[in-house]
From Swiss-Prot:
Keyword RNA-binding: yes
PANTHER family reported for this sequence: 39S RIBOSOMAL PROTEIN L10, MITOCHONDRIAL (PTHR11560)
Organism annotation: Bartonella quintana (strain Toulouse)
Name listed for the protein in its UniProt record: Large ribosomal subunit protein uL10
SUPFAM superfamilies: Ribosomal protein L10-like (SSF160369)
A Gene Ontology cellular-component term: large ribosomal subunit
MF-aspect GO terms: large ribosomal subunit rRNA binding; structural constituent of ribosome
Disulfide bonds: none
Described purpose of this protein according to its UniProt entry: Forms part of the ribosomal stalk, playing a central role in the interaction of the ribosome with GTP-bound translation factors.
Keyword Ribosomal protein on entry: yes
HAMAP family for the chain: Ribosomal_uL10 (MF_00362)
Family annotation (Pfam families): Ribosomal_L10
Listed GO biological process terms: translation
């Protein structure tokens, strides 16, 4: 990479850090190309991205962002997993780490908050934003459904009684 390419990459990475809801930093030493491609595709399907960057360039890109506090995590062969949804990157990274012992999560950030390895794992256990929205809609619509059932119940009971009398009249 020449200087202009490095400058452009740092600018792009800085923008990615600014837009991301969460960032996960991990060591990937020893992973095969197939495993890395698997991680990238899983992260992409979930709405996140994985980027391998030189530590020096990543540290420069972190300057002036909310995630600047994680600069110390960039030692050795590190990769960056990030997503706009704060739950996506940690969830995919933790799931991938369960099956690949050479993938070691170092920590991360969510906005201005630095995350330890345990914090990343606990964040991964939370439901995604879409799952939370679905639960909220379910909680709101359930009482309305029950009210409709209660209001319609007497009419249904009357109809069943009339139906029973009609059946009795036919058999008698």
């Amino acid at each position: 990479m020449n200087r202009a390419e490095k400058r452009e990459f740092v600018t792009w990475l800085n923008e990615a850090f600014r837009k991301s809801g969460s960032v996960v930093v991990a060591h990937y030493s020893g992973l095969t190309v197939l495993q890395m491609n698997s991680l990238r595709s899983k992260m992409g399907e979930a709405g996140g991205a994985v980027k391998v960057a030189k530590n020096r360039l990543a540290k420069i890109a972190l300057q002036g962002t909310e995630s600047e506090s994680i600069v110390d995590l960039f030692t050795g062969q590190t990769l960056i997993a990030y997503s706009e949804d704060p739950i996506t990157a940690p969830k995919v990274a933790v799931d991938f780490a369960k099956n690949n012992d050479k993938f070691v999560i170092l920590g991360g950030s969510m906005g201005a908050t630095s995350l330890s390895v345990d914090a990343v794992k606990s964040l991964a256990s939370l439901p995604s934003l879409n799952e939370l929205r679905a639960k909220l809609v379910g909680m709101i619509s359930t009482p309305a459904t029950r009210i409709a059932q209660i209001v319609n119940a007497p009419a249904g009971q009357v109809a069943r009684v009339i139906g029973a009398y009609a059946q009795e009249g036919k058999t008698a």
